[in-house]
């Protein structure tokens, strides 16, 4: 499925009954969050607030509020099909040369997809139909949501931040929230290991005293938005991966004020710079943990230009205790992670990040165990292989007879196959999300691995338990007469 832009995607959603237009005036201050939260928890549609109180620009919320809409945005008809996206990423991360002519034919579709990776730069674009600069720059024209009562200020949540480090051809796209400070200033909240922060750090080292160009695109096409939250290899641009998802080259246009490329079909683009040493205290904000986070200092983004479509809409979301939109996206992207991990660790059968664990703080892994100590190797692999799992605090490893996505199965394995002292690994002073106030020091905390697999010789001196299982012939006989027994036909069937 190909979408030319966000509006093309919205047209499809509306056709499928997955978009609700709200004409009643709704306030961006708290009311939109409450409506979007109730809708998401009920598995409801994307929401287009057509008449935000005090504004003429519509607000789009809850766009990726179900895993199915995430899959549609990535060009797939089902969540299960996202495994194919993961296989493509695994191939791009570590491409294998064909072993022969037949293997070359098998890999041909993957090589053909690579043709969509280069971007196509346009001379003019819809995102630059209107240009505001200088004193005319005013974020007050945009209905930026104030999500929670204790939030410090309105917050831009769905901005695709475009950066490029010195001597790099690849542009980085990342989604970092931005607190509004004034009509032309926001705080750029990015963590130190994220691509934008690394680009800025390298820039300040090589260009001391010079301004760092930045652009923020709002309302890009779904492939570009989702590419920015997908674990693409560090050497691959999110624009290139968006082209793979879309099946056509990503169309970009040069910024009005700098050499950065932005999505040509974006609804709104903020252009400007970061000044070395100019920082501000960000927060507090209600976050994906379900709590207000601590305040901290981050760079200030000064906006020199705002470009937009003539009839632009503003794409927004909120974060809160799961489920929220990031948690739903994490649930869908879980399917992308599995093939990537399996490429490195073929023994992995399934991998699950429960939404209740903030989508990254706890992982359950099932494996085909092959030797004593195998579970501990997998724990270390999860923590080290992908940057996305740097902050995963708990990893539970089970055998492949356990359903990683069924807590009844997992808890049974933990309580029958684990000895707390022998089967628990604790590591201190490891990187932790600074938003995790449970850690003793900001940015540093511990991790726990739990080996809930059956123990092999060398891991235990005791005779291991044999699972109970009914005789197969007996089960077959009872299957044959089960309906005739009619035991559960009086309202007791579960």
Swiss-Prot record:
Q: Where does prenylated FMN bind?
A: 175-177, 189-191, 194-195
Recorded name of the encoding gene: ubiD
Any idea which positions bind Mn(2+)?
A: 172, 238
Query: NCBIfam families per the record?
Result: PRK10922.1, UbiD family decarboxylase
Q: Which Pfam families match?
A: UbiD (PF01977), UbiD_C (PF20696), UbiD_N (PF20695)
Residues annotated as catalytic: 287
Q: Which InterPro entries match?
A: UbiD, UbiD-like_C, UbiD-like_N, UbiD_bacteria, UbiD_Rift_dom
| Cofactor(s) listed in the protein's UniProt record | prenylated FMN; Mn(2+)
Pathway(s) it belongs to:
Cofactor biosynthesis; ubiquinone biosynthesis
Family classification: Belongs to the UbiD family.
Taxonomic lineage from the root: Bacteria, Pseudomonadati, Pseudomonadota, Gammaproteobacteria, Enterobacterales
Q: Which GO terms describe its molecular function?
A: 3-octaprenyl-4-hydroxybenzoate carboxy-lyase activity; metal ion binding
- Indicate what this protein is called per its UniProt record: 3-octaprenyl-4-hydroxybenzoate carboxy-lyase
Output a single Gene Ontology CC term carried by this record.
cytosol
Q: Where in the cell is it found?
A: Cell membrane
Q: Which reaction does it catalyse?
A: a 4-hydroxy-3-(all-trans-polyprenyl)benzoate + H(+) = a 2-(all-trans-polyprenyl)phenol + CO2
One Gene Ontology term of the biological-process aspect is: ubiquinone biosynthetic process
């Amino acid at each position: 499925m190909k979408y030319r832009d966000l509006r093309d995607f919205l047209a499809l959603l509306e056709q499928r009954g997955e978009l609700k237009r709200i004409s009643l005036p709704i306030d961006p201050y708290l009311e939109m969050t409450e409506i979007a939260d109730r809708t998401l928890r009920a598995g409801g549609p994307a929401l287009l607030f057509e008449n935000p109180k005090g504004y003429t620009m519509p607000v789009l919320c809850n766009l990726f509020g179900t895993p199915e809409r995430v899959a549609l945005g990535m060009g797939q008809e089902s969540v299960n099909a996202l495994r194919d996206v993961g296989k493509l990423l695994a191939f791009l991360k570590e491409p294998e040369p064909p072993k022969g002519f037949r293997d070359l034919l098998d890999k041909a579709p993957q090589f053909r997809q690579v043709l969509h990776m280069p971007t196509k730069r346009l001379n003019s674009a819809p995102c630059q139909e209107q240009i505001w600069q200088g004193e005319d720059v005013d974020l007050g024209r945009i209905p930026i949501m104030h999500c929670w009562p204790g939030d410090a200020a309105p917050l831009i949540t769905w901005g695709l931040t475009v950066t490029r480090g010195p001597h790099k051809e690849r542009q980085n796209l990342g989604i970092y929230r931005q607190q509004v400070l004034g009509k032309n200033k926001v705080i750029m909240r990015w963590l130190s290991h994220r691509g934008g922060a690394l680009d800025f750090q390298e820039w300040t080292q090589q260009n001391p005293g010079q301004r760092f160009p930045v652009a923020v695109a709002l309302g890009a096409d779904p492939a570009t938005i989702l590419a920015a939250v997908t674990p693409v290899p560090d050497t691959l641009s999110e624009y290139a991966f968006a082209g793979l998802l879309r099946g056509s080259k990503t169309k970009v246009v040069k910024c009005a004020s700098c050499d950065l490329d932005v999505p040509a079909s974006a609804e709104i683009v903020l252009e400007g710079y970061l000044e070395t040493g100019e920082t501000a205290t960000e927060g507090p904000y209600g976050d994906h943990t379900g709590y207000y986070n601590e305040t901290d200092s981050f760079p200030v983004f000064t906006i020199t230009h705002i470009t937009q479509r003539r009839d632009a809409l503003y794409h927004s979301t909120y974060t809160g205790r799961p489920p929220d939109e990031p948690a739903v996206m994490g649930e869908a992207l879980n399917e992308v992670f599995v093939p990537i991990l399996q490429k490195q660790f073929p023994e992995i059968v399934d991998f699950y990040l429960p939404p209740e664990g903030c989508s990254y703080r706890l992982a359950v892994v099932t494996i085909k165990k092959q030797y004593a100590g195998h579970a501990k190797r997998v724990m270390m692999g999860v923590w080290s292989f992908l940057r996305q799992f740097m902050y995963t605090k708990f990893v539970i490893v089970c055998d492949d007879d356990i359903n990683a996505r069924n807590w009844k199965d997992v808890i049974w394995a933990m309580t029958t196959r684990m000895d707390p002292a022998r089967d628990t690994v604790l590591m201190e002073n490891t990187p932790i999300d600074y938003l995790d106030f449970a850690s003793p020091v900001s940015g540093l905390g511990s991790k726990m691995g739990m080996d809930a697999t059956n123990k092999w010789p060398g891991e235990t001196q005791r005779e291991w338990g044999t699972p109970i299982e009914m005789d197969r012939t007996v089960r077959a006989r009872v299957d044959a007469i089960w309906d005739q027994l009619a035991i559960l036909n009086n309202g007791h069937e579960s």
